[in-house]
Amino acid sequence: MKTAVFGRDSGEPGSPCGAPPSLTFTPPATLVPPTHHHSRSTNRGGVSGTGGGGSGGLQGAPGAGGPRASHSSRRTSRLHNNVSALGVLSLGADVLPEYKLQPTRIHHCTIVHYSPFKAVWDWIILLLVIYTAVFTPYVAAFLLRELQDTAKKSRFTEPLEIVDLIVDIMFIVDIIINFRTTYVNENDEACQVVSDPGKIATHYFKGWFIIDMVAAVPFDLLLVSTNSDETTTLIGLLKTARLLRLVRVARKLDRYSEYGAAVLLLLMATFALIAHWLACIWYAIGSAELSHKEYTWLHQLSKQLAQPYTSTNGTIPTGGPTLKSRYVTSLYFTLSTITSIGFGNVSATTDSEKIFTIIMMILGSLMYASVFGNVSAIIQRLYSGTARYHTEMSRLREFIRFHQIPNPLRQRLEEYFQHAWSYTNGIDMNLVLKGFPDCLQADICLHLNRNLLSGCAAFAGSTPGCLRALSMRFRTTHSPPGDTLVHRGDILTGLYFIARGSVEILNDDNTVMGILGKDDIFGENPLLYDEVGKSSCNVRALTYCDLHKILRDDLLDVLDMYPEFAETFCKNLTITYNLRDDAQSLRKKFDRHKLLRMSSSMNKDRYTTPPDGDHGNAAVRRSAESVSRCDSNPIDRRQSAGSRSSSRCSPPHAALTATRSEATPLLRRSTNHHEEDDALFDDIRAFARGNTVTMSPTVAGNSVSPTTAIHNDGIHSQQLSDRSDDYEERRANMFGRRLESIESQMERMQNKFNSDMETLIKLVKEQSIIRNNGSSNEEPNARYRPNNYISSAIRLPNGGGGGVVDEMRVSRLSSHEPPTPTQETDTIL
């Protein structure tokens, strides 16, 4: 058997999902909150007017143009184009979301807070703050005394002094820039950008001005004339005020807390920075007690390194360990203390050192728990996907073990779970979108199904609203190789669109009927059938497949909401393989023919009943009532039963006079049998109700007389009522004769069938004997071949969509000679 391959490229002409050249995909409109003056929407390509959906650019109202408006439009457009690129780099916490961006009237010499210049400037200030956080405590504890001694000789000769001066200047400039930088008014519902200089100054004074001003004061320049030790210590303490800027930096860096690696890096940097500060304080305590105490930790270090301090006449000791050794030892002691290790080779000896060590232990325990607890949480979050995968897999295996799932089903379950997890990473899209509004869900679904809706010709010409409604009802399914998507006999509840992979269509004996690939469609067209059909084939995945499925009811609901699109959809939809089982329509047609055959036999009995035409008419009417009840619902059947019991008291009041020849076999009727059947059913129902019946002349094969009118006759009805008892008796006799006739006919058919089967078995045995003997003379035995005797044909129409058995004939078998072409055949209903 040849295999039909229906897969084709999406760009091939005639492909069911090949989009025509005129099909364009319309993206969803961008959300814009209402404002007092203008209402514009921003797309990724530029700033466009409201009603537009244009190609970018700012579209203003007529009369509002001019060079000034054009310059403002170009400036706003340039700024907006850089917002997406600088959104991650910007440190401002008040960066507007892109869909809320509004073109504002920028004051002269005012800096927009989301401009590229402001983003770069914030990063420069961040680096200077980090430099200040590291070197300010170090200089105040280790180098301030040496720098003061050098300053007595000459100013600004040391590199650190020059760098500190530059940092002070940059902080002062940052204050000036903050007075000219816009901000977002969070108290306003519209979240407008404020560019008025007065409002900006008021907002800055209420915010970070005091902290920035204290951090920018050059205290070492203000106290340069004093040379006492107390002044030097005061300068060191005041210079640490620059660390207040870290609060502002920490607030801005909070926007990166969603990135696990960034948070891990920030936590480790924070831990190291605090240890650095504690090391500077630890050295400052030992250095302050060095002149009047001889058993500080610095003295112990000098003895261990054999580098003692020297002092004359109570002055500050000189010499001792190098600066590098002092800093490394201080940092070593603080880290061993806050991590609760404490080797003991460096220990506190004085009371001040012991008090600070106690404070450092308490602080270290809290910091250790918080920092490393967060580190554990971050690492666990990094591997949360793997943990969830193993958890779900364990649950699946427990389910298989508890319910004793057989191995084939177990393998299919595990393969599907692994494939679905690798495709979705364990994320349930329905659960994610559940908490969002319908409009946003529609936009997301439209984005996820954009390739299907824009590439399939069936959706060409649909409105954006119709596409949004369709995208909300599509469901994506994933299938591993070998998984059966549809079984034979399943209800066809949906329409399938193949997005990736290939499937095969199989019949009952696993014969491949077709192979479908990307952009193919299978199922049934719900617009062509009133009732849900059943699948006539099995559909099995050949490779890993991704399919878009829409339920029949959901599709019909959308087409009901958009009736103008229904005709276009039905016209453009090309189903690659129709799975509908046409045997359903065949059975319905057979039931209809059986009813018509009953009516045909009833008409025959009506004209051949000899005793009394009135009683024959009554029998016809009673039989017509039973035929009318065959296609009614249970309620109508109960009502008909009630009317039948009441009609026994009053015989029919109508007479039917018509002539007709013997009925022609039903399966030999002409091509116009549908119109004849409908007319016959209408006549039967009308006659059962006692109304006037008009019988139309039939087509070839029947000899019913032309139009015959039936009128009620009061006199004749009175005569019939007088003979009601005789009518009941004749009616019982008529049905008894009918039953005997049917039984005898069935017995003849059974005998004939048995005889034919015996003859067929005999011929098959003779054929096998001849074949075993190896006889080469075939002409004498040709008459005994079963293929020559059996002439059975089931002819189906050549049209698509299955069909109905038009004629079924079984030739009469003979035990002696095959039938001739002119021999009469029996028709079996």
Curated annotation (Swiss-Prot):
In this chain, the stretch annotated as Disordered covers: 1-76, 601-674
Task: List ligand-binding residues for a nucleoside 3',5'-cyclic phosphate.
Answer: 458-559
Pfam families to which the protein is assigned, alphabetical: cNMP_binding, Ion_trans
> Where along the chain is composition biased (Basic and acidic residues)?
603-615
Tell me which GO cellular component terms the UniProt record holds.
monoatomic ion channel complex; plasma membrane
Residue ranges annotated as compositionally biased, kind Low complexity, are 640-650
**Compositionally biased residues, Gly residues:** 46-66
- Reported effect, residue 203 to N: In sy557; causes spontaneous contractions of the spicule muscles, inducing spicule protraction in the absence of mating cues
Sugar-bearing residues?
A: 313
Q: Which residues lie on this side of the membrane: Cytoplasmic?
A: 1-123, 180-203, 256-261, 376-829
Q: Does the keyword Kinase apply?
A: no
Family statement: Belongs to the potassium channel family. H (Eag) (TC 1.A.1.20) subfamily. Kv11.1/KCNH2 sub-subfamily.
- Report the protein's function: Pore-forming (alpha) subunit of voltage-gated inwardly rectifying potassium channel. Channel properties are modulated by cAMP and subunit assembly. Regulates the movements of the male's copulatory spicules before and during male mating behavior.
What's this protein's name? Potassium voltage-gated channel unc-103
Q: Which species expresses this protein natively?
A: Caenorhabditis elegans
| Gene behind this protein | unc-103
